[in-house]
UniProtKB/Swiss-Prot annotation:
It is found in: Hydrogenosome. One of its GO terms (molecular function) is 2 iron, 2 sulfur cluster binding. Ferredoxins are iron-sulfur proteins that transfer electrons in a wide variety of metabolic reactions. Residues 1-8 form a propeptide. Binds 1 [2Fe-2S] cluster. Its main location: other. It comes from Psalteriomonas lanterna (Amoeboflagellate). Its cofactor is [2Fe-2S] cluster. Keywords: 2Fe-2S, Electron transport, Hydrogenosome, Iron, Iron-sulfur, Metal-binding, Transport. GO terms for cellular component: hydrogenosome. It comes from the Eukaryota. This is Ferredoxin. [2Fe-2S] cluster binds at C45, C51, C54.
Amino acid sequence: MVSGVSRNAARTSSGCIVALVSTDDDYTSQDVTTIPQAIRFPSSCLVTYSCVSCYLAIPSGKLHAASSFEHVLECTVAPVSEYVKSVFVGSSIECTGRSGSVTFALV
């Protein structure tokens, strides 16, 4: 997948910012701050999107596994970290962490 601009949040057409996490390892229910490839943005918003295979960063700071679904997520996450790369292209958001990438397609 294509990596984008480091330290830039991926914004939807409505201006919302999403939080994404790669699925290269099993991080289910662990705190976001303990996960090296957590993709985190300093804002909160309501975003509707479909996810093929990924983890979601939710308000509680926990991660929940997901595998092909559509979901409305209200996210409040930690400040963006220096190792995150993300890019918003057309109707999808591609993000790259230290050990993998994930693409979210906006619904």
